[in-house]
């Protein structure tokens, strides 16, 4: 991967930054043991101010995207197999998706799939493009494979919440939208005082169907390096071809649309970056101005223990 651009100066504080679960525990904000008893590994309970912060980030991200002209959408959290195979490869499906036993339904791994699926087998007037949607949803993923020490806590989990954005547009506009989408995520993180960078994925690292992709990474003061918090992808006409998403022009000519998607914010990983970058020497966590209206005016969170 090649670094495209860096936004904000990474800061290494002059005090030790604890692991994110330790920070959360200082606020009585996470219970992994109870979650393990209830659902197994890869789940969590968020409590108190940490749970409130989680909801605040989602609410802020929703309003952020609405203010940028996106239509807010609450999509289905389950999708049929013809939609699954239209938006991703079988290998990706097998590694990610949970199937509902006895039903032709899968739990979504991202709301991108159900938002893109909204347009299955449609012919859309060119004059109505682009369609720009943003949604909040829970996401469910198998997350197969071994996980390292840095993936404990809420870093890699089976259930999480995410604000997503998708675009359906004319082919000649897709690269313009690609740049707009990842810049939305960068702007969101910077508004919360979190340094980020973008990495362009090489062709060998691209998932099936993707034409171009960029990862957004946030700075971790504890690890003194960046870690992935989202990705933006241009899928060209690959999904549109599989799902039958067509466009009709003024001359009645029909052609395939282009589809794009991008993570606005996934709070579990974003919370890691947020807590580390806003942690103070006394253990309190500063609340950036943009989040204060969603936190009842709170300017900082104070540890409970």
Identify the residue ranges that each predicted region occupies.
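TRNA-recognition modules of translation machinery and tRNA-sensing kinases, especially anticodon-binding
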Residues: 6-305
